[in-house]
C-alpha cells in the first residue's frame, strides 16, 4: 500500500513543478518583452507670416535655440509706411465720425438759411419773368424759343431752391442715424486696418517658437520671400518620443501609461525611462526601417513612448531597445 502512495506523491510533485515552471516562464515572458524602435524628435519649419526682403538672420545650423529668441528680420520699411498710412486713415475717420455726432453749428445753420432766402428770391424772379414771357408769347411778340428759355431758368431756380431748403432742414434736424452709423463703420474699418498694419510690422521679426537645435538654414539675407516660405528648420528639444511596433500577441502588455526602460548603444548599462503614450488602433505591416528579428510581414501596432528623462544624447532616428519588465515599474 505504501508503494502506490509514494508513486502518487511523486506524480503530484512532478505536476506541481511543471505547473509552477509554466507559470514562471509565462510571467517571465510577460515581463521580459523586448521591442526595437527609433528616436522620433519633432521638427518645425519656421517662416515669416508676411513676405518681403530678408534683411538679416542671426543663427546658423547647429546653433542651440531658445524659445522667444530673435532669429531674423525682414526689411521693415514697407510695413512702417503702411502703418503710418493706417494711422492717418484712423485720424480721418475719427474726425468724420466726430463731425457727424456733433451736428451743425449755429453759424452753418444761419448760412444755410441765407442761402434759402437767396434761392427763393432767384426763383421768384424767374417765375415772374416766365409769367411775362408767357403773355408776350401769346401776343406773338416773342418766339417759342424765348419762352422755353424762360421756363428752363424758372425750373433751374426751383431746383436750386429745393436743394437749399433740404440742406437747411438737415442742418436744423442734425445728421441722419444712417449717416452716423456709416461714419462709425468707416472708423471701425480704419481701426481694423491699423491693427493689421501693426501685426504685419510685428511679424517682420522671426521669433523661435520653442527650444531646440537649428537643423537647416534655407535662405540667406537679401532673398525675396513669400509669406509662409520656409526660412529655418528647428529640431525641438522636447518632447522626445520613441516609435516602436508590437505584434498582436503582445499587444495586451502595451497599455498607455506603462513604464518602460529604453536602452541605446551609447549607454547600454544606464537606461532611459519612458511611458507608453499612444497605441495605434490600426494594424499595419512592419515598416522596413524597423530593426526587429521578427518577420516583417507580420501585422503590428505602432507605439509612441514618451522619454521622461531625455537628454541631448538622443538624436533623431537613433535605434533604441525597448524593455518591458518589473525593473521599469520600480526604478
Curated annotation (Swiss-Prot):
Protein family: Belongs to the UPF0194 family.
Gene name of the encoded protein: ybhG
GO cellular component, one term: periplasmic space
Protein name: UPF0194 membrane protein YbhG
Cited InterPro entries: CusB_D23 (IPR032317), UPF0194_membrane_YbhG (IPR022936), UPF0194_transport (IPR050465)
Signal sequence, start to end: 1-19
HAMAP family listed in its UniProt record: UPF0194
Coiled-coil portions: 140-209
Organism per entry: Salmonella typhi
Keywords of the record: Coiled coil, Periplasm, Signal
Localization terms from the record: Periplasm
NCBIfam families: PRK03598.1
Cysteine disulfide links: none
